[in-house]
Amino acid sequence: MSLLDAQSEIDVRGRLPRTARMFTGDDFNFVGLIESGSDALLGAFAAFAPNASAAIQALDAGDVDRYRRILGPTEALARQVFAAPTQYYKTGVAFLSWLNGHQSAFSMVGGLHSARSLPHLGEIVRLAREADALEQPELAESRWNALLKVNGL
């Protein structure tokens, strides 16, 4: 479920039988929702999978503070990746994949890599740094600077 309203999702979950599982798809409020009992099924996790994995493992181990420290900063990053127009969120996911060395080029079918502006991508870079979501910071910086240079900046 993705209502993009944390309290509404909690209310719906509260009306379900205990045997039912509700997966949150709320890419804006997932930290509190997962902590409060929603299972996660999030597109945002594709953008920062190592952070998500470490945070969920911490939560499973009962270390709520570590969970919050790891996953908390990723909410702002997810909000930027999924900012309106939301249908272009894949550009942000592909961009982070490229920055992190998982793709050899920042290119998407149909030219969708150009669906987001450089300022939008720059904010993704800033938020990814703050969230410790750049797996290879030096590579990410080099690739970001190369993209800026190609665009005359």
Features from the language model and the residues they span:
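Catalytic alpha/beta core domains of metabolic enzymes, predominantly
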Residues: 1-87
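C-terminal alpha-helical cap/extension of soluble enzyme domains
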Residues: 53-153
